Amino acid sequence: MTAIRLYVDADACPVKDEIYRVAERHGVSVSVVAGGYIRVPDHPLIERIAAGPGMDAADDWIAERAGKTDIVITADIPLASRCVKAGASVIAPNGKPFTEQSIGMTLAVRNLMTDLRASGEMTGGPRSFQPRDRSAFLSALDQAIRRIRRACAARQG
């Protein structure tokens, strides 16, 4: 069976502990990627990646590796776009999936909001992380793992 790997854009990710538990339950490997040092549990399925300095070093590291049997967890919309184009499943920490159908509009709205904030016409950012977001994320991650496993099994037999 093809191995599924989870790539976690770890800087400011509020669901890392949940990712570790789901990965252990499903026997899925996890790459926790950050620009610098980040603490991760000592577990054979979990690896820490310090992608190095640079504003997009962690994003580039993930985008260069993510593929069809991988799941990327990120709130970074440009990174999500790159990974969706590479065929990876992408889930935001609030459980929202980024798909081929949704990523174009999501990226356009993100760019518009960035421009509005830069011009001073709008302030603020996304709403705060809620307990229901954690639940939605866990459900979305379980579904993505099961979907990829079914697709791999169908291709093999």
From Swiss-Prot:
CDD domains: PIN_YqxD-like
Bridged cysteine pairs (disulfide): none
Xref: InterPro entries: UPF0178 (IPR003791)
Family to which this protein belongs: Belongs to the UPF0178 family.
Record protein name field: UPF0178 protein Nwi_2152
Source species: Nitrobacter winogradskyi (strain ATCC 25391 / DSM 10237 / CIP 104748 / NCIMB 11846 / Nb-255)
